[in-house]
Amino acid sequence: MLDIQLLRKDLDGVAKRLADRGYPLDVAAFSALEAERRAIQTRTEELQARRNSLSKQIGAMKGRGEDTSAVMAEVGGIGDEMKASAVKLDEIQARLSELMLEMPNVPHESVPVGRDETENVEVRRWGAPRQFDFDVKDHVDVGTPLGLDFETGAKLSGARFTVLRGPIARLHRALAQFMLDTHTQQHGYSETYTPYIVNPDVLYGTGQLPKFAEDMFRVEKGGAENTVTQYLISTSEISLTNTVRDSIVEASALPIKLTAHSPCFRSEAGSYGRDTRGMIRQHQFDKVEMVQIVAPEASYAALDEMVGHAEAILQKLELPYRVVALCTGDMGFSAAKTFDLEVWLPAQNTYREISSCSNTESFQARRMQARFRNAQGKPELVHTLNGSGLAVGRTLVAVLENYQNADGSVTVPVALRPYMGGVERIDAPSSAA
């Protein structure tokens, strides 16, 4: 959530910056509500002052033995008007809050202005795409003989679900464990296990609600009269970040660096017809997430660090990738600045997103009331960051395509072999011993 003081001081400036990311801020509606709020507050202050004055007058009159009934009646009328004003003020505050919950974060000044992903800016590349001396297959054709089972996934759960069997399942597990070990042993993150089902207020905290309810899977528990609605997490960013909601941490505890491996559940509303083949876009997929909670002055250094942590995974796996700065029109709702990592997929002859690292500044913290005690001992909002480290399924796709061999086998990346019991190659059934 944006700082309401920023909106009050520079409404037109905020509107312009939000327009850069395609959000039309209703300046007239906000201004009208603010004007009404100020008028009610001013009137309430006048009534309070008048009531205080009359209360003193009543005391003096009683001391002189005078009749106070008329003044008492006026005080009663003031009280009734103040109660009505309080109700009206609550209504206006609720409407302001509703309006502000719909507003995305203001882009950082360094974010390139653009309409959509076509105007993102490439920052750097790492690794050269492998030159194959045979016809490259996509991950579906490579993986199906090795244990990718889309047919059974569809039979069990419908489209965009996959069953992994045998060596493919083991490789998938190895990737997740390798990522967690790298982040905890080399990058300073604390491994965390959190629930996969969360309450709605948690999703308000990180910005998925109210705007993106259609992207979430809802779950309900209880009888018809006592139904409680909860949601499956679309990323463990949600649960990890909310571990500091409604709290004040000491400055000495910062930065807090958390990582988790979890399934993620997304309805993929609005993605009909996109990436229908294979594992690129699934309703359920695994991801290793990185979250940092930091002091405000440290957040952009932390963003660069987090991007480096995601890059380290790809480099250890020797997968070519590029880093892209997202433009204003392509950033997520809560982000002030985002870098995407895109891995090379030879079958598509292009780079595809495998990680997104964002600094939300105080946007999520304000919604969660997540604070730290600053040098002056006063509570101050933290900054929160999140990043994929990495999407496990898409990393599996990249390994299958980049490490495929002409005979249908897949070479296991050196970094993963300790997690595969020393196995160096996954063989297709036709060449298995």
Swiss-Prot record:
Residues that bind L-serine: T235, S236, E237, E289, S388
Primary localisation category: cytoplasm
EC numbers, comma separated: 6.1.1.11
Subcellular location: Cytoplasm
UniProt GO cellular component terms: cytoplasm
Gene3D superfamilies, alphabetized: Bira Bifunctional Protein, Domain 2 (3.30.930.10), Serine-tRNA synthetase, tRNA binding domain (1.10.287.40)
Keyword Nucleotidyltransferase found: no
Reactions accelerated catalytically: tRNA(Ser) + L-serine + ATP = L-seryl-tRNA(Ser) + AMP + diphosphate + H(+); tRNA(Sec) + L-serine + ATP = L-seryl-tRNA(Sec) + AMP + diphosphate + H(+)
Domain of life: Bacteria
Family from the record: Belongs to the class-II aminoacyl-tRNA synthetase family. Type-1 seryl-tRNA synthetase subfamily.
Oligomer status and interactors: Homodimer. The tRNA molecule binds across the dimer.
Protein name in UniProt: Serine--tRNA ligase
Annotated organism of origin: Burkholderia mallei (strain ATCC 23344)
Designated gene of the protein: serS
